[in-house]
Design a protein with these regions (language model features):
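N-terminal glycine-rich flavin-associated loop
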Residues: 1-8, 35-37, 46
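Short beta-alpha junctions and helix-cap segments that line functional grooves
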Residues: 13, 41, 57-59, 101-105
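A short, Trp-centered hydrophobic/proline-enriched beta-strand micro-motif
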Residues: 20-29
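Glycine-rich beta->alpha junctions and the first turn(s) of the following alpha-helix
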Residues: 88, 98-196
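Hydrophobic, small-residue-rich alpha-helical packing segments that form membrane-like cores
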Residues: 17, 34-41, 47-48, 52, ...
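Short Gly/Pro-enriched turn/cap motifs at secondary-structure boundaries
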Residues: 33-36, 60-63, 79-80, 106-113
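Buried hydrophobic positions in well-ordered alpha/beta secondary-structure cores of metabolic enzymes
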Residues: 6, 27, 45, 54-56, ...
């Protein structure tokens, strides 16, 4: 929103996001058949009069059930080359036709809900287009680059915390009359965890 939204859109959404009025925002790019290759998305937005009509589904959307607004990418020119003809939109939570599925049951990161977001004849105002028509894929790619830095930092932090917990555990747990930290096999495992 900060990068490409109009001034009106920024004034409408940024204060709500920054103040906590909106607990989160949703980044709706990934689809079940277009994850690693989001340019192959199928979600469509068709202009009908002064409204965009959106149909499709987005998968693995972080904090969707808490989002006040969604940044959505959809195909607006199906005849364009791959990666072209995709536009970016702002869709408010509670818009009729916007359906948030129950949270996925994940192996980890339970404090961060992940949901499917379905758009079933979801109608949004024409001025919900963010940035230029058919130029939204460039926006998505540039935003993903910054997000990867955050994911890398998060992953490193989780890994280091896991090693800290493991080190604490092996120094407390005893077997055969000694701390398991004294066993060479355990030491190898911790060394591998540190170096990997």
């Amino acid at each position: 929103i900060e990068s490409v939204a109009s001034e009106e859109q920024k004034q409408k959404y940024l204060p709500k996001l920054c103040s906590g009025e909106y607990a989160a925002g949703g980044f709706c790019l990934t689809e079940s058949g277009a994850g690693s290759d989001p340019s192959g998305m199928k979600t469509k937005a068709v202009l009908e009069g002064d409204e965009w009509v959106i149909n499709g589904a987005k998968q693995f959307i972080t904090s969707a059930e808490y989002a006040g607004v969604f940044v959505l990418w959809a195909v607006t020119d199906p005849d364009a080359k791959r990666g072209k003809g995709i536009s970016c939109f702002l869709v408010e939570a509670g818009t009729p036709g916007l359906i948030i599925s129950p949270a996925e049951k994940k192996m980890g990161q339970h404090a961060s809900a992940t949901n499917e977001v379905v758009f079933d004849n979801c109608r949004i105002p024409k001025d919900s287009l963010m940035g230029s028509l058919n130029q939204g894929f460039k926006v998505a790619v540039s935003e993903l680059a910054g997000g990867r830095i955050g994911i890398g930092s998060l992953s490193l932090g989780i890994g280091l915390a896991a090693i800290d917990y493991a080190r604490e555990y092996v120094n407390e747990r005893e077997q055969f009359g000694q701390k398991i930290a004294n066993f060479q096999g355990i030491q190898w495992m911790l060394a591998d965890a540190y170096t990997d």
